Amino acid sequence: VLWQRASGRILEMGAGTGLNLPYYPAGAEIMACDLSKGMLHKAVERARGKNVRIIFCEADICHLPFPDGAFDTTAETFVFCSLADPVPCLREMGRVTKPGGQILLLDHVRIERPLIGPLMDLLNTATVRLAGEHITHRMDAFVRAAGLEIVESQRLGFMGIFQFIVARPGT
């Protein structure tokens, strides 16, 4: 499981209803942030009885209320596909991650295949309008534009529709 890589003090950005919380290592110390108070209430219920220490925080993930370098690991799952431009939030992840810490990202992205990629480009306008989902993001480019260093990148799922990236704050 991808989130087993998380260590130290962990920030989950866009925690939603807490679906990831059971997958963090036992004994983890997690700050779970989301803009939606309703989602956080559901996350609190889901977290009951888990072997992790969780603090919930209502916050805008692009303007976090934490000092620089406050977390060893920052993570997000399927959050940035809902943003037209995730670069400011990626910069914020870099800011609150300690030097030498890790940034874990999992999102759906554009499939880089001759027919599928252009089809996704055509469908993107509709998916943004109907569901608020940007299906043509190129996360590698966004991560680099935010000044972060990519340590590992894996395409997952059917034709690589998902991308898992491990990054760290730039030097």
Where are these regions (language model features)?
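Class I SAM-dependent methyltransferase SAM/SAH-binding core
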Residues: 9-63
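Short glycine-centered segments of the SAM/dcSAM-binding site in methyltransferase folds
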Residues: 29, 100-102
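A short acidic, Gly/Pro-enriched loop at the edge of an enzyme's catalytic core
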Residues: 62-74
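A short SAM/SAH-binding and catalytic strip from SAM-dependent methyltransferases
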Residues: 72-85
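A short glycine-rich, Lys/Arg-flanked "PGG" loop and its adjoining helix->strand segment in the class I
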Residues: 87-99
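C-terminal alpha-helical "lid/dimerization" subdomain adjacent to the S-adenosyl-L-methionine
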Residues: 91, 104-162
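C-terminal lobe and adjacent flexible extensions of AdoMet/dcAdoMet transferase-like proteins
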Residues: 164-171
